[in-house]
Amino acid sequence: MIPGELITDGPDHLLNEGRRTVTLVVQNTADRPIQVGSHYHFAETNAALGFDRDAARGMRLNIASGTAVRFEPGQQRTVELVDFAGERKIYGFRGLIQGAL
């Protein structure tokens, strides 16, 4: 067993099943890599990432918890975002929301 590894006896687990998702094209206009973690409010990411921030409001990357996506300088890639769940209150990050969505 690898530290942190999960071994299940059932079928594959579907992440975020039934939640609203959005697919966006993201361009890194910076001269260095930018990495975004799984639960970062995507609309508040580094300003050098070019994408539709209004469409990303209240959403995060639709990837496994604890993982991240890296955008190399000049790279363009398509990402899938998923709605935040729970109370849908956003605090911290770049301080743009600081409360309910």
From Swiss-Prot:
PANTHER family: UREASE. Gene3D superfamilies: Urease, beta subunit. GO terms for biological process: urea catabolic process. It catalyses: urea + 2 H2O + H(+) = hydrogencarbonate + 2 NH4(+). Coiled coil: none annotated. This is Urease subunit beta. It is an enzyme of class 3 (hydrolase). Pathway: Nitrogen metabolism; urea degradation; CO(2) and NH(3) from urea (urease route): step 1/1. Heterotrimer of UreA (gamma), UreB (beta) and UreC (alpha) subunits. Three heterotrimers associate to form the active enzyme. The keyword Oxidoreductase does not apply. GO terms for molecular function: urease activity. InterPro entries: Urease_beta-like (IPR002019), Urease_betasu_sf (IPR036461), Urease_subunit (IPR050069). Its EC number is 3.5.1.5. GO terms for cellular component: urease complex. It comes from Polaromonas naphthalenivorans (strain CJ2). Belongs to the urease beta subunit family. It comes from the Bacteria. Keywords: Cytoplasm, Hydrolase. The keyword Transmembrane helix does not apply. It is found in: Cytoplasm.
